[in-house]
Amino acid sequence: MKSKIIIFFLIFIYILKANLLIAENLNIKSKKIKIDEKKGITIFQNKVEAYDQSQNYVSGNYGEFEKNKEILILKGNVNLKTKEGYTVSTEQIKVDNLSGIIESTEESLLKDLEGNEISVEMFRYNRDNNIFSSVGKIIVNDKNKNKYKFSEIYIDEKNKKIIGSDLRAF
């Protein structure tokens, strides 16, 4: 009886550990996949789609995944939908699965659930605390057709708050 309990406990630990390992990975799919062993990357082409452990969804035309660093770079008509429902359209996004950061140095358009549109030169999204941040030229067009310009902005998805600096309203 004692050995059965030990075996059951070991199986339980194994299953739990296996599920944790799966949760830490990105789930990536594409119509065309190629492995470049020299560079240590996997290349995805034609409708690349990926979900991270927080269920954030990102898609694009082309992607490269570096397994050792757990970094996915998507290029070409890239779209991000966060688990909270915010969307981002841009030309390139980097998903750092180890740090939990999704970012772009390209011009991007963010849309929140209330219909506000935020145009940024770059952004950084922390999936652990659901906060977007950006510095540079930022234009917010709210649902009431008001236009605001900022030089720095923070968007808290969970609390639905936008905090900006150097406001200019038009």
What are the roles of these predicted feature ranges?
Residues 1-23:
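Gram-negative bacterial Sec-dependent N-terminal signal peptides
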Residues 19-170:
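N-terminal amphipathic/hydrophobic interface segments
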